[in-house]
């Protein structure tokens, strides 16, 4: 085999080894649950066109009713929680359909928490003015409500009147999923003009306890001027603030691996928006916010503006639905499908499609793998034939090398002439590898970032396709009463992957270069340890893909 081809294949293998070795040995695949505390915010001291980023924390907001302050209970198929009538803040939200782990007594996932709790995190929609004389609702305002429960069937109407007779009305609705709609109306019954600005903010206390996972974005995110803006927590911490003046803001928010909190402002105007960080009283606070231009409301006039808050699980079909229904640009990109988005999302659609028929994502992975294999059959067939031809030409290539060992230019010329004469493409054997690399990463991404794959079982001992195989050969798959260290957690599926990889190599033509042949023999063992911590769904794909390749190679050997 030509040295250039050997180098190319070796480079591909080395690149994969470096990428996944780094992931395994340096970057842990999951961030631990982060401890969060957050600040309560005030919005009265805003300058024109700019929302104050971070404010001092309050100490009087808890989930329970206090000092006579009631809460509006949120109750839907997907959500439970409450909204405080003091300050009208979304600071108590639980996702009913998701558990924190697979244990029987696992609590449900909590997204929002009040400001004086350990995991504080909340959203807020309100009004501000650049004139201090204008009396607006603030964090101490006690709103009046016509209902104690907010549900998809029953919106909540709130009102508050200031000392000048100006009436502030808020209507809150929630759908069956995770979208709140907040319509604010100002009725100017005073004899003065009111300069009003609408704002929204999401504030979170976040302290990283582990190094971030580089293959996944977590932190401030948004679509501004139809461009996706992503900033890690470290980015914002270093910059302190990232500002966007007078921009088209489709949505901004804070994303986790599976969960998203997002502000979706009214599309009637442009907005100034900010991604901010501050360290106050020993706590790290992150905030995303937007503020509208000044709207002058004349005496006797009304003004209404509608904003939305998404707070929930990043389900692909749900984000797609909202994106189309409300024209929210790039809303599906809150799911980090990565560089191969154009491949990864169709792969997910295919898996989800077959899941609708078979009811098991593991089986769906098997079906999609078969389809991919069929689509690539012709290419793989040509590749295998080319590899066999290259092996048959190796004696002649060795003769040419000996003949022109002192003349590299002539050597390459003669070898290329031989390829042309025998109609051999020297890179054909590499094409399936190059094509499968983005497919491999796409399937990995689907398993790693989509909520649909979280805590879903296969068969037998596999209860979560997005987690590593929980068994290990070092305690005889649970027969021995001890737990090996994590680097020895080599389960049945990693072993099956390595065995099928070894068998596939045995059926393939060996590399002509003895050194490369020796290296290839160790690859199944290297990959066994390297991939043991990867999602078991990926190992199911790889093992099944190897089995199909073995069948394909048997077919080619027999009939060609």
From Swiss-Prot:
<dbReference type="InterPro" id="IPR028053">
    <property type="entry name" value="Membr_insert_YidC_N"/>
</dbReference>
<dbReference type="GO" id="GO:0032977">
    <property type="term" value="F:membrane insertase activity"/>
</dbReference>
<dbReference type="GO" id="GO:0005886">
    <property type="term" value="C:plasma membrane"/>
</dbReference>
<feature type="transmembrane region" description="Helical">
    <location>
        <begin position="357"/>
        <end position="377"/>
    </location>
</feature>
<keyword id="KW-0143">Chaperone</keyword>
<feature type="transmembrane region" description="Helical">
    <location>
        <begin position="431"/>
        <end position="451"/>
    </location>
</feature>
<comment type="similarity">
    <text>Belongs to the OXA1/ALB3/YidC family. Type 1 subfamily.</text>
</comment>
<feature type="transmembrane region" description="Helical">
    <location>
        <begin position="476"/>
        <end position="496"/>
    </location>
</feature>
<keyword id="KW-0812">Transmembrane</keyword>
<dbReference type="InterPro" id="IPR019998">
    <property type="entry name" value="Membr_insert_YidC"/>
</dbReference>
<dbReference type="InterPro" id="IPR038221">
    <property type="entry name" value="YidC_periplasmic_sf"/>
</dbReference>
<feature type="transmembrane region" description="Helical">
    <location>
        <begin position="334"/>
        <end position="354"/>
    </location>
</feature>
<dbReference type="GO" id="GO:0015031">
    <property type="term" value="P:protein transport"/>
</dbReference>
<comment type="function">
    <text>Required for the insertion and/or proper folding and/or complex formation of integral membrane proteins into the membrane. Involved in integration of membrane proteins that insert both dependently and independently of the Sec translocase complex, as well as at least some lipoproteins. Aids folding of multispanning membrane proteins.</text>
</comment>
<dbReference type="InterPro" id="IPR047196">
    <property type="entry name" value="YidC_ALB_C"/>
</dbReference>
<keyword id="KW-0472">Membrane</keyword>
<feature type="transmembrane region" description="Helical">
    <location>
        <begin position="5"/>
        <end position="25"/>
    </location>
</feature>
<protein>
    <recommendedName>
        <fullName>Membrane protein insertase YidC</fullName>
    </recommendedName>
</protein>
<dbReference type="Pfam" id="PF14849">
    <property type="entry name" value="YidC_periplas"/>
</dbReference>
<keyword id="KW-0997">Cell inner membrane</keyword>
<dbReference type="Pfam" id="PF02096">
    <property type="entry name" value="60KD_IMP"/>
</dbReference>
<dbReference type="InterPro" id="IPR001708">
    <property type="entry name" value="YidC/ALB3/OXA1/COX18"/>
</dbReference>
<keyword id="KW-0813">Transport</keyword>
<feature type="transmembrane region" description="Helical">
    <location>
        <begin position="522"/>
        <end position="542"/>
    </location>
</feature>
<keyword id="KW-1133">Transmembrane helix</keyword>
<dbReference type="InterPro" id="IPR028055">
    <property type="entry name" value="YidC/Oxa/ALB_C"/>
</dbReference>
<keyword id="KW-1003">Cell membrane</keyword>
<comment type="subunit">
    <text>Interacts with the Sec translocase complex via SecD. Specifically interacts with transmembrane segments of nascent integral membrane proteins during membrane integration.</text>
</comment>
<keyword id="KW-0653">Protein transport</keyword>
<dbReference type="GO" id="GO:0051205">
    <property type="term" value="P:protein insertion into membrane"/>
</dbReference>
């Amino acid at each position: 085999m030509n040295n250039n081809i050997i180098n190319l294949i070796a480079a591909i293998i080395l690149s994969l080894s470096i990428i996944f070795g780094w992931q395994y040995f340096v970057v842990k695949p999951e961030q631990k649950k982060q401890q969060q505390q957050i600040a309560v915010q005030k919005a009265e001291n805003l300058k024109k066109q700019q929302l104050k980023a971070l404010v001092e924390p309050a100490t009087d907001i808890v989930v329970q009713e206090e000092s006579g302050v009631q809460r509006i209970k949120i109750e839907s198929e997907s959500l439970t929680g409450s909204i405080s009538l003091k300050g009208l803040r979304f600071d108590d939200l639980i996702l009913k359909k998701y558990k924190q782990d697979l244990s029987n007594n696992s609590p449900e996932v909590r997204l929002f928490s009040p400001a004086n709790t350990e995991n504080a995190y909340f959203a807020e929609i309100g009004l501000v003015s650049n004139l201090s004389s204008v009396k607006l609702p603030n964090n101490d305002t006690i709103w009046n409500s016509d209902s104690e429960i907010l549900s998809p069937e029953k919106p909540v109407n709130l009102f508050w009147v200031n000392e000048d007779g100006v009436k502030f009305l808020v209507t809150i609705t929630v759908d069956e999923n995770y979208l709140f709609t907040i319509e604010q109306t100002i009725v100017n019954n005073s004899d003065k003009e009111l300069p009003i600005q609408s704002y929204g903010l999401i504030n979170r206390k976040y302290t990283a306890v582990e190094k971030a996972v580089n293959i996944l974005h977590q932190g401030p995110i948004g679509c501004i001027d139809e461009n996706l803006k992503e900033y890690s927590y470290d980015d914002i911490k270093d910059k302190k603030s990232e500002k966007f003046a007078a921009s088209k803001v489709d949505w901004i928010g804070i994303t986790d691996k599976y969960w998203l909190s997002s502000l979706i402002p009214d599309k009637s105007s442009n907005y100034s928006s900010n991604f901010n960080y501050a360290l106050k009283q020993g706590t790290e606070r992150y905030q995303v916010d937007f503020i509208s231009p000044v709207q002058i409301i004349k005496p006797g006039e009304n003004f209404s503006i509608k904003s939305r808050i998404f707070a929930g699980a990043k389900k692909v079909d749900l984000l797609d639905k909202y994106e189309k229904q409300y024209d929210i640009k790039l809303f599906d990109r809150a799911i980090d499908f990565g560089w191969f988005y154009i491949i990864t999302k169709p792969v997910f659609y295919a898996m989800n499609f077959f899941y609708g028929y078979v009811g098991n994502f593991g089986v769906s992975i098997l079906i999609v793998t078969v389809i991919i294999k069929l689509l690539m059959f012709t290419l793989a067939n040509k590749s295998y034939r080319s590899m066999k031809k290259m092996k048959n030409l190796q004696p002649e290539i060795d003769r040419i090398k000996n003949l022109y060992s002192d003349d590299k230019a002539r050597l390459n010329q003669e070898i290329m002439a031989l390829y042309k004469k025998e109609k051999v493409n020297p890179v054909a054997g590499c094409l399936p590898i190059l094509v499968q690399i983005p497919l491999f990463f796409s399937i990995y991404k689907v398993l790693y970032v989509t909520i649909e794959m979280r805590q879903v079982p296969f068969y037998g001992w596999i209860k979560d396709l997005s987690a590593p195989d929980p068994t290990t050969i070092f305690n005889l798959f649970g027969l021995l009463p001890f737990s090996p260290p994590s680097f020895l957690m080599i389960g049945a599926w990693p072993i099956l992957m390595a065995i099928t990889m070894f068998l596939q190599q045995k059926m393939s033509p060996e590399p002509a270069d003895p050194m490369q042949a020796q290296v290839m023999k160790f690859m199944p063992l290297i990959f066994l340890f390297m991939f043991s911590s990867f999602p078991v769904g990926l190992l199911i794909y790889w093992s099944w893909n190897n089995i199909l390749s073995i069948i394909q190679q048997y077919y080619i050997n027999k009939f060609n």
